[in-house]
Amino acid sequence: ALEDIIFLGDEPVEIWRRAFSGSGYYNNPKNWENGVLYVGNHLAETDENISGVVNIRPGTVSVAESAFESRHLITGVNIPYGVRYIHQGAFRDCSQLKTITVPGSVESISYHTFEGCTSLEKVVIEDGVKRVGEIFGRDCQNVTQVVLPDSLTYLDSALFHGTSILNNIKPVNGVYYIGKYLLYADEEIVKGKVIVKNGTTAIAAHAFRECNMITSVELPASLRHINQGAFDSCANLASVKFSEGIEVIDPEAFIGCPIPKFNLPKSIKRIGSRAFFSNAYENSSRWDEKNGLYYEGNIALAGEYYMPETVTVKKGTKIIADGILGGSRPKRVIIPA
């Protein structure tokens, strides 16, 4: 029977639900601390009878998937600075949990973290957290206050689904903002030209998905991140005005949009896979047919599925978008100095 587990290093690992249940390690009382099972610096599971306020041990790096799921007797959890990942469903169905603070050391809060927390009212996410998914979901109607940090680079448009938060946000021409973030657009209202509010730093994943009545978008200089699928399948979106300052365009951000040309700013640092994938540029003269690459200025933006065995990237290219060389997998890629 498994009696000991040793993780070398403190890097976060994803521990799946009930990963050690029934093992010798799990059944050894010496491995439990105040109703919590730790594996190295990872919080793996909790006892079903754990109650009151839980103080997670200092030095903990991650909270495992479903670690506190259905622990109906806990009323609070103190998460120490140093925890880096909170995995999917970590606090799902904690029916007596009312408030919780996520420290700034956490890099990512995964999906459905607080789903089914029927008594939850307030969540504070401290500055430093970078990514927040759809952390609520069903039975979170009592959540009326969520404090978001200025540090977010990724958030999901479904972040507040299942809560009462959206009831307290007044949309601007069908677009919902919270703090510095554009969260969501009502596809039945937004139309024509959309001017994203100045001061916005990120557009949430899938925020404008299938908003087929919009024809053009103007982005502010404050914008830094366009998250995955933000304008996915906007069938009539033919023009986007970018401003200097934007740094990251995530995968499939404008997939399926008939945009014939992109004037991308010099501030761009990364472009995700298929960020602008559509049939709008199939016959464009900006294709380097010999090497199977499509360019917008000094950015290699797309690649043909079938490429030659040797691909030479154009001299002066500053950015190669994610995944564009992954089609037929050329044997040799030459990148000029």
State where each predicted segment sits.
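Structural signature of tandem-repeat unit edges
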Residues: 1-14, 24-40, 47-62, 71-85, ...
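Consensus positions within tandem repeat domains that build extended binding/scaffold surfaces
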Residues: 17-19, 65-67, 87-90, 110-113, ...
